Every structure is written in structure tokens, then in C-alpha cells.
Amino acid sequence: MAGQVVQYGRHRKRRNYARISEVLELPNLIEIQTKSYDWFLKEGLLEMFRDISPIEDFTGNLSLEFVDYRLGEPKYDLEESKNRDATYAAPLRVKVRLIIKETGEVKEQEVFMGDFPLMTDTGTFVINGAERVIVSQLVRSPSVYFNEKIDKNGRENYDATIIPNRGAWLEYETDAKDVVYVRIDRTRKLPLTVLLRALGFSTDQEIVDLLGDSEYLRNTLEKDGTENTEQALLEIYERLRPGEPPTVENAKSLLYSRFFDPKRYDLASVGRYKANKKLHLKHRLFNQKLAEPIVNSETGEIVVDEGTVLDRRKLDEIMDVLETNANSEVFELEGSVIDEPVEIQSIKVYVPNDEEGRTTTVIGNALPDSEVKCITPADIVASMSYFFNLLNGIGYTDDIDHLGNRRLRSVGELLQNQFRIGLSRMERVVRERMSIQDTDSITPQQLINIRPVIASIKEFFGSSQLSQFMDQANPLAELTHKRRLSALGPGGLTRERAQMEVRDVHYSHYGRMCPIETPEGPNIGLINSLSSYARVNEFGFIETPYRKVDLDTNSITDQIDYLTADEEDSYVVAQANSRLDENGRFLDDEVVCRFRGNNTVMAKEKMDYMDVSPKQVVSAATACIPFLENDDSNRALMGANMQRQAVPLMNPEAPFVGTGMEHVAARDSGAAITAKHRGRVEHVESNEILVRRLVEENGTEHEGELDRYPLAKFKRSNSGTCYNQRPIVSIGDVVEYNEILADGPSMELGEMALGRNVVVGFMTWDGYNYEDAVIMSERLVKDDVYTSIHIEEYESEARDTKLGPEEITRDIPNVSESALKNLDDRGIVYVGAEVKDGDILVGKVTPKGVTELTAEERLLHAIFGEKAREVRDTSLRVPHGAGGIVLDVKVFNREEGDDTLSPGVNQLVRVYIVQKRKIHVGDKMCGRHGNKGVISKIVPEEDMPYLPDGRPIDIMLNPLGVPSRMNIGQVLELHLGMAAKNLGIHVASPVFDGANDDDVWSTIEEAGMARDGKTVLYDGRTGEPFDNRISVGVMYMLKLAHMVDDKLHARSTGPYSLVTQQPLGGKAQFGGQRFGEMEVWALEAYGAAYTLQEILTYKSDDTVGRVKTYESIVKGENISRPSVPESFRVLMKELQSLGLDVKVMDEHDNEIEMADVDDEDAAERKVDLQQKSAPESQKETTD
């Protein structure tokens, strides 16, 4: 027997075919969210308050400091927040200190700074009652970038950019005459030496001594019209502020504020880390030949002689000396923007491949401290030196798509940036108030206006592109949404601008971003998913784990290192499936490995690291596809994406053929209930589980406190599916930390169960499975195999209007008693009622304007002393195509002190309607390999082809769907699934390390089946065997969220667009079907003139004709001739508005009067076809 039995959770054993042992547990899959938010609460907020403190007034007398903060208890708990449509948030209280310097008085106060949304344990936020996810954003990291470009004459040129986290950009470039220019903040360019002079290197000689003589520098100095620091400063000021009178002081303060003011310019810790890495000597001298010795600055001894070529080993030896600033020089810069001395390191090296033996200077930035978040003059000089070195062939250009140059902004940082915006707006208000208020009676509370802070947080959660309504179709969709990485959003790319290179798979994605899971369509490659083992480091770079190789013994150690993409570029990494002996040594002399972008074979001695697992390349969703290695990547992409659209079924079932990821994905998704502590189950019922903690002290175990776990029962998920949790533990069970206590939707016994295992045959049947269509047995309908539960929410609110309050009541004008049969005495539908479209759910009347009374009404009024109530019916009705059973009704009243109602609303009623949807013709089904299709026919069980033992098969798929799509994984799954079913076992075939052909065939033989996996099938209609043996097996098939019930739509009359008077489009607007250009051609080709005329007039925008036609149909008369369509009139008006004289003539050249039909004409005919005229903005967009 191939494979070994592995336990997944408490309830499931699987036969696992993996050959590579797991050396590292999968991390918690949503820690990217939870860790980042924890960092924000612990450090991020504090950092913000530190940055902004102190706020001083213009005279410097008052100073306001933020000392400390704390989060209080949330007003509503999680469940209550969801029920009340509230935000799950805790009050943020900040300790503020006000110092009055004149008197030395200090006032301290705790100030409330708004409610701060809290993250749930499962990595989501509840905002206005709905669960939302903050997606992590992939952005370009702040750093110094150099890139190569070819100009129009085919010459190689370079440009450089210093990109901060916030602040002005600094760019260097060369032109056709080999002059080097600088641009400050995207303005006009200046010769580079102007900026150097402004920094205090004032004479030509100083500049040449600093950067080393080169042709480019000489050309630039010739072009430079300034001669000293003052002139350079004025020149820069004129460029940045044209039209303003330049003075040296103004120029200095402008340059200071652009680059050296920490409030305006911020490299962030990540920018400082990247700049030091790029500009320091230790990374730039690799493989260079020294033109001067390297001297230890402390002892004065020569560490490396002139003429030495520095290879990796040599560099490692002198690393400490380089870091203690060998060959460093300190410049005292006169008249510069910054008064402090500038320290730089410079070493002369020989220009590579130069016959004349010229030298060039390599200047490093002398490693400013990581606390220095601004750019320093040393950074600017070192970046210029790097640029000149590049022109001499020393150094590397950067690849912007490399993950070493792209970083993640997760929840914490995104929130911090948003909070910073709010605080800086608040800072302005505080300053203004300081100058107005009386200093004696002033308190911190009076100075602080928290509105801008609250507004910026609200804006972020409510309307940011990265704050998204959680995709809750099933647990996998939830999990993937939390692990999504988006390159879109504020400060990121836009769809239109994103080039092919940004979207493409890059070698640095290996183990960090999934190369498979990305949307099809305009966002392809811009939205990605985090790989299964990846994690994010403190700087926001994605790291992936590798097993360290001991270089002395050449064996794999137990040490696991997490490497970022640019660290990995220095190492050779062996694949996870390299053969090892029991001591961890490589068995083969030549090992398949990766070095940067190359997959190659190298000697085993060259290996530095080894992959942790074969599935570290792919994301959680992709890792759920068995036999992924046998599928074409395009289909695997569809498979990974479609699993997220699977609808939770009423009776879910875990796959016979899994990958072992099902348990982990279910546990971490947040849909299951997991134990927070080790304990013993004391009580289990359908809606709650009680667990007594077991605490270990001094080696003995004793009972601790009791934990309550409430279960969600038949709730509506964000996607309108049924969210239900079922306990899977029993009283007395001892559960471990993080063990699953209750299954969520689409789960069975602690494993993800998105679909069902069904018996599938690859065969055609009367052409019904043409073009990927699916033929299904009626058994699957009858036995509720693919039945799902859907819950819709409808709400109605009674508001105050100008004419009086709306009222929720059973007393509705002009409605029969039968229409009110489901309403209780309040006028609200009762729970359990069965409703269909058009039925009233909530009776509501709205006051109408008072009209002139008729004689009869006046008489009634005189007799009974009351005016007949003037109200119109605005009841909430079931929309078209909906209906079902009323599951729940929630009523919120203002009288009962419900402060969550929005202003002007007196009463709010929410009605939940549940539908049980069996599977239909027209529903979309798919497997896990991107094999999707629509059900074309549901065949009675007795007519389905049956196996030799008489069992009819469940589904027939077209064999032509396999070869051209190249997703052979489905065929292997089919065979292995049949064997697993016959053996009564579940199997796991992990990605890239699963069952191979031999394993599949041997398992098939073990199950007593024919080795080719084929069988004789008999036609259910005739009882005859089919001509050839057919592949029949068990495949895991899912029902997708694209259901025909949601798409079916019909209209006779309905709303029309306001200007063109054509019917609206789309089901949501109750629109019509657009009869477009090509359809018109079809009728023209047939010569169907009258049909065409009626489609373009009565059925579209002939306003008079359609009213008359409706009348004629009702009265049974002949239909009159059509009149002029409204869109023709719109065209005429359009031309007339351009000043053209447009008239319509008949065949006798008589002008035809184009009378406007107004609403009164239509009203006379007593037929209002325009049930509601929609604004022009809703005009049809569908074709």
C-alpha cells in the first residue's frame, strides 16, 4: 500500500501519498491581519502621538503633549453590533498635557478621541453591522532606485530616483550630450552640480575631488552657470518658486523644508534600511579592484592592499572594518543648508574593463543611524556617486517588479497613515484655538477638536478602496480575502496604467506570492494572494522560510531562516524534493536548484538553503487542488478562483480526494469555532458549547474557568447564503488549544467541504453535453445533494416627512383583505409565512398633500367630522423573482430608546426570507481543476447510464473538455476517487508531492477495479451496453454562486429612461432586453419589416404608440400605426441645439409637426406605463 495514514483534526484520517516529510507547520493563515493590527494598537498609535507632540502655538508659550492612551470597553459586543447595524468599536481615551511656559503651569486631562474600530479574532472589522476586510496593499518601497533606459538613438542611459515615504522626489538623469541633471520634485531640471554646490561643495575643484574626475562631471560643470553655494541656492529657488524674489535665506529654508525637515520629508524606517543597503560601501565593492588601500580608521593599519579584487569571502572578512567607517572623511560645509558636518566614506577603484587604467571614486553614506528618517547630505552625495559609478559600469540597476523593491502595507500601517491625516488636521485646529483662547482658563479639552480624527477613520473604513465588504460565500473565500494583496488603491497603481511587466509572474514571487491565484479580467496580476508559508517582516517585505544547509558538512540542519526576496538573491536554493539520506546530506552530486531567476543544476557543495515544502509556492486556495501538478496553469487559476464561489450546501461532504489543506483552511478561516484554551467539554447544544479550562500548574492539572462559545444559527452571510454552525464535539471530550469545536458553513467534521463527491462518467449523451454542458441525474435533485439555503434581507423604515410621519400599519388603502393575510395586527409579516413576489411584507402608508375635496367628500366630512385620510401605499413588497419563507423579523423603535436609528427614522423593520434552492437546469457547476459547465438537462434516474452492478451514475461530462484544456488532474482525481470510495477511505494528495501514476493504479487495483479505470456502462433507456468502455469515477463537484434563479428575468412594461424614453436595462432596474445593432441586422436580413418596426417603436420609445397599444390589447382592438420614436426627437433637438435648422418633411415636402407629447395626454388615457421613470444616469449599459 502506497502512502501512510495521517490524522487531520479529531475526526478524520486520510491516506497521505506525500513522500516529503513536513518540517514546518503551516503558520496561522490570517496572522497577516491580526499581527499587523496588534502592532498598530501597541506601537503604531504611540508612534503617531509621539510624532505630533508637542503642538506649540505661534509664540511658543503654550505646548500640548500627548502622553499616553488607552482603549475602553466596546459599547456593544460583536453580536449586538451586527444586530444593531453598529460599528464594533472601543472608545479611545488619550492623556493630554498642556504646559503654559509663562507661568510654568501644567494641566493634564484625559480626552475622548472617538470610537476606534476593533478587529475581531478572525481578522475582520464590523462597520455599520457588516463585516469588512482591510486588504493589504503592495506598493513601491521608499528607496534609491537606479534604472537603465535606451534613448531614441539606441544609446544606454541611466536615471535615478530617490523615493521617500512622503516628501519630494529627487531624480538624476543624463541627456544626449552626456550632461547629468537633477530634478527636484518633478520640476524643471538643473545641472547636478548646482545641487552639490547648494549642499556646500562650492568650487569646481571641491566637486572634482569629491566625486573623482570623469567626462560626465566635466560636461556637467561646463553646463553649470553657478560658481558658489549662494548662487546655486538662488538658482534652485528660482526653479522651484518662479516669480518670487530670491534671497539666500529663503532658498535655504525652502531646500531645508523640502528634504531635511522631518515633518515634511519621511523616508520611514524601511526607506532608511533600503537606502543604507543600497548606498553603503559593503554592497558596492563586490568584485571591484582597489586603486587605494583600505585603512582601519581606529588603528590606522592597512586592512586590504591596493590592487586587491574584493570577492565575497574577502568582503565578509573586512565587513566590520567597513562598518566602522574605514576611509571616512568629514566635511565642514560653509554656508550650506545644514550646518552639521557631513561624514562620508570614499574608496578609489579601477574602472572595470578600462585599458587606460582610469580610477573612479565609490562614495558610501557612512550608514546613518536607523532613527534618521530624513535624507542626509551624505545620502545625496552617495547616490550621485552611485550614478557616476553606473556610468562607469560599477553597480547594479534595480528591477522595480522584484519583491525586494515592493512592500506590503497591511491593516496597521494603512490605519496609521489615515490616523496621521486626521491628527495633522486636528493639529491645525489646536494651533488656531491656542491663539484665540484665554491662557488662564484654557484646558486641553477646549483645544482639541476630535472631529477630523473621527472623520478620517470613518472615511477609511467606509469608503477606502482597500476596505472591502467581506466575501463570505464560503470559508475559503473568507480566508483568501484576508490574505489578498492588492497593487491598486490610494498610492498604488491604477488598472489602466499598469503595464504587462507589473502584472507578470516574477521569479522573486517564489514562496511569497501565488503565481496561480489571481482574477481573470482587468485586474489580472494586480490582485494576488499570499503564499501558504509566507510572512511579512517589520519593514513590510514578504519573507519565505528555507532550511539552512551547513556549509561545512553539506547537510540540511533543523534551522529555518525566513528570507526576503533581496536576501535570497545572494543564495543558491535547492528544491524541496531533493533526495536526502537520514543525516540530511544530499544523495545526488548534482542538485536541481534556483539562483536568482535561473533554474539550474549545480554541485551539492554550492547549496546554501533548501525549500521547506513543495506547497510553499502556492496560496491556500491553490493548495486545495489535488493533482495540481497535472493541470495547465490557466485552468488551475480558474479552479482556485471558482472554489471561492462555491455555495455552502445543506448537506456538505469533505472530498474523498483532498490535499490535506482542507483541515487547516477550515480552522483558520474564521468560519469554524475553535477552542481558545485547552479544556474539557461540559455542555453541548445546538447554539452553544461550554468548555471548562484545564490549567497545568507544578505538573498537576486542575480545572479553571468556564468558556462560553455561542454558535451562529441560520444567519445571513454577506453573500446572502446561510451561515450556520454545528457542534462536532461531545460532552467529556478533552479539547486542545485551537481545536475545532463546531463546523461552520461548507464544513464537515472539521474539514472544508465545498461540494459533494459524485459518480461521474466521461461520455456524451444525445449531444446534451455539447460545449461543456453538464448532464445530471434526477437523484441529485431528489436527495437534496446540491440543495443550498439562501437568506435575503429586506428593510423598510418609517420616516418623518414634510406632511407628517409615515406609519407602519395593517390599514392600507385600496388593498384586498387577501393581500393582508400574512400580516399581524402591527402590519408586519409573521415569521413562518410563505410569501411570493408582490406580497406585502411590511404595510406602510405615507401622508399625501391635501387636495381640494369633492362635494361627496365634503358631505362625509360634515357628517362624520373627520377628513378622509389622505395617504398613499408605500408598503414593502417582495421584489420580482424572490420569495420564500419568513425566517425572522426585527423591529427597531425610536421610542424604545434605540439610538442606532439614523436621524428622521422612527421605526425600522427588517425581514429575513429564506429559500431552499434545489439544483436547476441553468445552474453552474465546476470541479476543482477549472472544469466548469452549465447544467443542460436533468435526466430521470432510470434513464441514466448504469454500472454493471446496477448503480446509475450521477453526472455525465463531455470527454472533449479534457484534451484541449490540458487539466488532466481531473482524470486522475476521478480514478483515485473511485478507488477511495470502494475502499471506504479518504485520501490526501498534496500539491507537487501527491500520488503519482503508479500510486493511482496500485490503489485502483487494491480496490479491485480494472487497472485502466474504465468500466462497461449500460444505457438506462435500452439496457444495451455502450460500444466502448467508459472512464467512470468519483469527482468532487461544486455548485457555484451563479444560479439561474438570480439571473432569470422577464418584463412586459416597466420603467423607462427619462430623456430617451427607452426601457432601462438590467434585472436590478426591472429593465428590458436591448435589441441591439446586430439584432436589427438579423431582422433586416430576413426582411421582417413590420416586426422590426414594432420593436423600434411600440416596444421601445414611441411614447404615444405604446400607450395606445396597451389600450388596444386590453380592449381587444386592432393596434394603430406607430408614431415618431422619442429618440428621433432627441436627435432633432440635439441638432437644433447646435444651431442647425432641422425639419421633418413628408413625401410631398410638407413639414410634419413634431408635437411634444406631455404627461397630460398620457394621463387622459388613464394608463401609466411609466411605472417609474428612472434618471438618465441609470440608462441601460448592458448590451
Curated annotation (Swiss-Prot):
Any one GO CC term of this protein is: DNA-directed RNA polymerase complex
Task: Tell me which family the UniProt entry assigns to this protein.
Answer: Belongs to the RNA polymerase beta chain family.
Q: How does it assemble?
A: The RNAP catalytic core consists of 2 alpha, 1 beta, 1 beta' and 1 omega subunit. When a sigma factor is associated with the core the holoenzyme is formed, which can initiate transcription.
Give the EC class as a word: transferase
Which PANTHER family does this UniProt record tie to the protein? DNA-DIRECTED RNA POLYMERASE I SUBUNIT 2 (PTHR20856)
Give the gene name: rpoB
Ranges of compositional bias, category Acidic residues: 1151-1162
Q: Which InterPro entries does the entry link to?
A: DNA-dir_RNA_pol_bsu_external_1, DNA-dir_RNA_pol_su2, DNA-dir_RNAP_su2_dom, DNA-dir_RNAP_su2_hyb_sf, RNA_pol_bsu_bac, RNA_pol_bsu_CS, RNA_pol_bsu_protrusion, RNA_pol_Rpb2_2
Show the SUPFAM superfamilies listed in the entry.
beta and beta-prime subunits of DNA dependent RNA-polymerase (SSF64484)
State what this protein does.
DNA-dependent RNA polymerase catalyzes the transcription of DNA into RNA using the four ribonucleoside triphosphates as substrates.
Q: Which organism is it from?
A: Staphylococcus epidermidis (strain ATCC 35984 / DSM 28319 / BCRC 17069 / CCUG 31568 / BM 3577 / RP62A)
Region Disordered, residue ranges = 1151-1183
- The answer to whether keyword Transferase applies is yes
Specify the protein name.
Answer: DNA-directed RNA polymerase subunit beta
Q: Which residues form a coiled coil?
A: none
